[in-house]
């Protein structure tokens, strides 16, 4: 899942799970998998040649060198080093509060949050109107308004069509970008040496 509005894109390591299970769910391998998916989607679906991805920490103050948790040192940083060695431009881990609050997210093509509310709370605070939920790595293109079904306002004349309209536009853009990507990688020239 990638939540996006314009150039602000947030993806998640974990999905809809209880907060009590977040730390035990996050592994080096899971972070590497999500970074690879996010990176590929930014390239193929959003036509970003060399995406820069910021990765948020799990613990406050990025664990404060192990004082507030060891996940950064034992899991997140090793995953970032591995993926960086594979050519993915990933940086962090950044403390979520200061990173989002200072606007540092604007210097990156995407932000990988460790869990649902860590990524979605600031996204919805900063970009709710017109936000789009995009599902990466599917053979079909799937978008929806970032606000979800919004049953609480259904039939009350309160809903804005902006997120729905943006979801359609994103789907069209992704379709075109995928066509270009497919054409660019079709029939590559053979090496002549």
Please give the residue ranges for each predicted region.
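Anion-binding alpha/beta catalytic cores of soluble intermediary-metabolism enzymes, centered on
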Residues: 1-71, 77-193
């Amino acid at each position: 899942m990638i939540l996006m509005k314009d150039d602000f894109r947030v993806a998640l390591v974990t999905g809809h799970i209880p907060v009590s299970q977040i730390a035990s769910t996050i592994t080096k391998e899971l972070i590497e998998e999500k970074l690879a998916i996010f990176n590929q989607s930014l390239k193929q679906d959003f036509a970003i040649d060399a995406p820069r991805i910021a990765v948020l920490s799990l613990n406050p103050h990025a664990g404060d060198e192990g004082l507030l948790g060891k996940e950064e040192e034992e899991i997140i940083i090793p995953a970032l080093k591995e993926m960086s060695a594979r050519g993915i431009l990933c940086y962090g881990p950044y403390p979520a509060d200061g990173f989002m609050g200072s606007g540092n997210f604007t210097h990156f093509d995407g932000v990988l949050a460790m869990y649902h509310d860590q990524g979605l709370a600031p996204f919805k605070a900063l970009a709710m109107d017109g936000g789009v939920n995009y599902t990466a790595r599917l053979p079909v293109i799937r978008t929806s308004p970032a606000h979800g079904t919004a049953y609480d306002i259904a039939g009350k004349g309160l809903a804005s069509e902006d997120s729905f309209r943006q979801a359609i536009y994103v789907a069209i853009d992704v379709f075109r970008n995928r066509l270009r990507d497919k054409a660019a990688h079709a029939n590559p020239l053979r090496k002549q040496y």
